[in-house]
């Protein structure tokens, strides 16, 4: 029992190196390093470099591109280098230091000839004998790698590649429940037991190996313990060894991790996976593991050689000259080279890049207003801070920080404002919002696209239920869509007719004999479809939509807003009246819309339309778990129009005028259009006027927004008809880049719209409304940071990882991807499950960067004491800041910016 508990603990702790990966159809951005954020970004970068040879700093080409484009100010980098050198004193001639710095900061690689020089070996051996305890012991942990990594097979590749191929084969077989007609036998028992049943008949193993498989324990934990003992792995190194195996195929392991969280009967799936993988490794390695050295001396010797070669190359000191110095001097030189290694300078380049962006953003905000203080209207608020308010965790609050309830600016909307449109914080909404505000008397608002509703949606036109909220939060309610019974019966019949046709096609395709006949039957139709879709993508797509709308028209639907009893549902269906009031109040507070209502309030979710795109969900709403957010917008709009809800809101201090009407729409990000999802049958006269005004302005808004967006796509130049061109991109099934998605995202601004209104933020900024004056206890800010800001950081780091290490964290070239097992994409038929973004999503061309890989900058518009309180109360966020997983800046009531580092 003790051993099994230990193995459980090892696996639980080792999971930190991977992230749960949802199927590609419900793709949701994930931070690949979320489990590692207890360590600093720099330490994780060093660790990944050592254990997997993965570099998560921007490389030389990316840095040079950023400098050439003006995104990275070299003077900022040079100042960082100067500051770093001033912090230390080295007893080394200054000209050697200068030469070393001038050379290494270019990020040039050390030529192989330096590593192979005999004098370098002599110096390395000398240092190893004298000081290996002082300088190399820290590298011992990184030697705990899978045995198969250290053994080279007859083809000259690590034996771990054979292990990977075996695991890809078996994992695909287990996961595939939808594409194949015959699923893995005995999979209902467990992955491990199904593998035991089949592997003993697998002739890719020798007869002796199959006999070993027959004798394996039925308990996967016992199997893991047995293999680790067989390899003589120390118990203190169990976790590091298991982590190495999880990192070997982080995509497939991440998919199993996700499934283990979703289904109780698969909760031990990672344990099964590791047991199988370790057995396969043991079978393939055989007795060769005895030749693998257990100590770190060979790694340490190689490290010394690399460091000596680096010193000689970057300082321009020949190795024979180095040998002329005494041992203590040599040790000083090498210690300097070890301290000032290339990763240190890569990190400084990254920081300089981020500081340059931060400076440019501040200048944009300052240039957009005569002063930030004027935009904040500080004279309207009576603020009193403790003398130590600027010091984190030393804050006193008093009631004088409350908002003056009689403030005319806060309680009255501008007389000319006709509509207020609340958009998702998605960076793609920023240009669209800017063009809407420029087109007429319209105000825009930023809020997370799930609108604060923790729901699972059950839509009539979707096959499966979907959690329509951020992936880190479980749904608390289920909302069903329903229609008139007669209309629903007709629609279901139409659905069944369509699905039966597709099911028949799939059945023939996936079975041996019928698949031989399928080309003859479907060839003419599919050939015609291919030609039409290739030559006239926009027209063919429009025609298909017309046919679909005619033959499979979704009926007018309603939502189960009120609580219903449903014994078949594991979640409450609908809300109680008080819950409706509470969720409406919370959403309005998060939008900073508790007064000054316009006649027409639009809640706009967003969706993306593309054709033949396995990654379409990555372009949908991240706050809704990789789906469109129109459903949530419709639900909240319907709730806010209810008289009993408005009465409850009034009792809570939020008065919505009777003439104000809420509606719902979807912002289609691939075409920059606004599609109505829900408009009440009856509108007040002023709401109707606002609705018509917005509709009249929308064609011009779409044209301007599309022109701005299309100009950034690399494959087209200036276009005369941007709306039609955008529709063509969204309809073209050969288009690998229908839109840029969230590429170039860089910042998250939490504050009043006046701070950024009219400023071109280039579609790089998540914008969330917030007024610190209405948030006395800081709960609203904490909610924004814990939800939307966290989602934004995950998105940011997924784009970052896919750019700096595309081979490990990206998903390769879209044109050569293979959709596998209905869950993700591979390159070829035996690769890891590629869970990041494709090359075309982050690069404009093979050697031309588009996305700028910098960590998210969170900007909070509030006094210092508010931010300090946030850091004191939210340890999770404070750790992200202190460990450099994101950057934090604030702008206070006097217009002063402050970086919290």
UniProtKB/Swiss-Prot annotation:
It comes from the Bacteria. The keyword Flavoprotein does not apply. One of its GO terms (cellular component) is plasma membrane. The keyword Transit peptide does not apply. It comes from Staphylococcus aureus (strain MSSA476). Its main location: membrane. It is found in: Cell membrane. PANTHER family: INORGANIC CARBON TRANSPORTER SUBUNIT DABA-RELATED, UPF0753 PROTEIN AQ_863. This is Probable inorganic carbon transporter subunit DabA. Part of an energy-coupled inorganic carbon pump. The gene is dabA. Keywords: Cell membrane, Membrane, Metal-binding, Transport, Zinc.
């Amino acid at each position: 029992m003790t051993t099994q508990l230990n193995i459980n603990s090892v696996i639980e702790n080792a999971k930190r190196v991977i992230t749960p990966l949802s199927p590609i159809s419900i793709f949701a951005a994930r931070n690949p390093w979320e489990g590692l954020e207890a360590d600093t970004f720099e330490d994780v970068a060093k660790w990944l470099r050592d254990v997997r040879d993965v570099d998560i700093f921007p490389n030389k080409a990316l840095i040079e591109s950023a400098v050439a484009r003006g995104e990275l100010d070299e003077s900022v980098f040079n100042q960082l280098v100067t500051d770093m050198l001033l912090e230390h004193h080295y007893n080394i001639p200054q000209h050697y230091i200068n030469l070393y710095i001038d050379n290494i900061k270019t990020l040039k690689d050390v030529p192989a000839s330096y590593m192979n020089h005999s004098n370098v070996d002599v110096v390395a051996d000398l240092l190893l004998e004298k000081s290996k305890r002082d300088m190399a012991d820290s590298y011992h942990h990184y030697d705990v790698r899978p045995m198969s990594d250290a053994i080279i097979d007859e083809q000259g590749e690590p034996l771990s590649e054979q292990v990977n191929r075996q695991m890809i084969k078996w994992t695909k077989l287990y996961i595939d429940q939808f594409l194949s007609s015959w699923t893995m036998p005995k999979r209902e028992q467990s992955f491990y037991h199904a593998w035991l049943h089949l592997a003993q008949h697998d002739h890719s193993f020798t007869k002796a190996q199959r006999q070993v498989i027959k004798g394996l324990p039925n308990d996967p934990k016992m199997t893991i313990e047995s293999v680790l003992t067989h390899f003589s792995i120390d118990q203190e190194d169990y976790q590091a060894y298991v982590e190495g195996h999880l990192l070997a195929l982080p995509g497939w392991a991440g998919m199993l991790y996700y499934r283990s969280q979703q289904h109780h009967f698969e909760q031990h799936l990672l344990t099964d996976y590791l047991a199988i993988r370790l057995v396969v490794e043991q079978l393939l390695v055989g007795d060769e593991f005895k030749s693998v050295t257990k100590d770190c001396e060979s790694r340490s010797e190689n490290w010394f050689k690399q460091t000596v070669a680096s010193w000689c190359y970057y300082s321009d000191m020949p190795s024979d000259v180095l040998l002329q110095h005494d041992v203590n001097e040599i040790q000083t030189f090498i210690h300097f080279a070890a301290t000032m290694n290339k990763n240190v300078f890569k990190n400084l380049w990254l920081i300089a890049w981020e500081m340059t962006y931060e400076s440019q953003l501040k200048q944009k905000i300052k240039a957009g207003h005569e002063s930030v203080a004027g935009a904040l209207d500080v004279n309207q608020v009576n603020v009193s801070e403790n003398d130590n308010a600027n010091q984190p965790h030393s804050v006193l609050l008093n009631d004088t920080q409350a908002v003056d309830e009689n403030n005319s600016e806060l309680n009255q909307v501008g007389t000319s404002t006709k509509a207020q449109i609340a958009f998702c914080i998605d960076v793609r909404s920023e240009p669209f919002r800017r063009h809407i505000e420029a087109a007429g008397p319209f105000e825009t608002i930023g809020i997370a696209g799930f609108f604060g509703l923790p729901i699972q949606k059950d839509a009539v036109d979707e096959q499966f239920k979907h959690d329509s909220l951020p992936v880190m939060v479980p749904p608390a309610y289920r909302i069903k869509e329903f229609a008139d019974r007669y209309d629903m019966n007709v629609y279901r019949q139409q659905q069944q007719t369509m699905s039966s046709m597709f099911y028949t096609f799939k059945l023939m395709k996936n079975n041996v004999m019928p698949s031989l006949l399928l080309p003859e039957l479907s060839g003419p139709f599919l050939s015609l479809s291919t030609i039409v879709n290739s030559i006239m993508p926009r027209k063919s797509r429009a025609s298909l939509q017309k046919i679909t709308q005619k033959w499979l028209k979704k009926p007018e639907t309603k939502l189960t807003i009120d609580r219903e009893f449903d014994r078949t549902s594991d979640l409450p269906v609908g809300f109680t009246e008080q819950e409706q009031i509470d969720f409406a109040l919370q959403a309005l507070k998060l939008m900073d819309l508790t007064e000054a209502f316009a006649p027409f309030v639009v809640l706009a979710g967003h969706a993306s339309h593309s054709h033949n795109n396995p990654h379409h969900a990555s372009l949908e709403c991240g706050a809704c778990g990789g789906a469109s957010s129109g459903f949530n917008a419709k639900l909240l709009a319907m709730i806010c129009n209810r008289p009993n809800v408005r009465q409850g809101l009034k009792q809570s201090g939020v008065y919505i005028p009777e003439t104000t009407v809420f509606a719902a729409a979807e912002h289609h990000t691939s075409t920059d259009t606004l599609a109505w999802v829900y408009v009440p049958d009856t509108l007040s006269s002023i709401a109707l006027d606002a609705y018509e005004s917005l509709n009249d302005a929308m064609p011009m808004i779409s044209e301007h927004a599309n022109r701005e967006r299309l100009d950034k796509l690399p494959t087209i130049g200036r276009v005369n008809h941007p709306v039609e061109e955008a529709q063509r991109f969204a309809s073209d099934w050969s288009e690998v880049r229908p839109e840029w998605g969230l590429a170039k995202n860089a910042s998250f601004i939490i504050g009043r719209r006046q701070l950024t209104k009219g400023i071109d933020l280039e579609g790089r900024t998540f914008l969330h409304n917030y007024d610190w004056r209405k948030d006395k206890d800081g709960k609203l800010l904490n909610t924004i940071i814990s939800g939307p800001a966290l989602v934004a950081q995950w998105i940011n780091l997924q784009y970052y990882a896919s750019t700096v290490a595309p081979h490990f964290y990206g998903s390769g070239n879209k044109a050569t991807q293979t959709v596998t097992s209905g869950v993700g994409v591979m390159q070829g038929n035996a690769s890891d499950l590629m869970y990041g973004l494709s090359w075309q999503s982050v690069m404009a061309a093979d050697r031309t960067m588009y996305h700028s890989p910098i960590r998210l900058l969170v900007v909070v518009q509030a006094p210092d004491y508010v931010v300090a309180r946030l850091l004191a109360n939210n340890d999770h966020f404070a750790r992200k800041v202190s460990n450099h997983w994101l950057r934090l800046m604030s702008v206070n009531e006097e217009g002063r910016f402050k970086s919290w580092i």
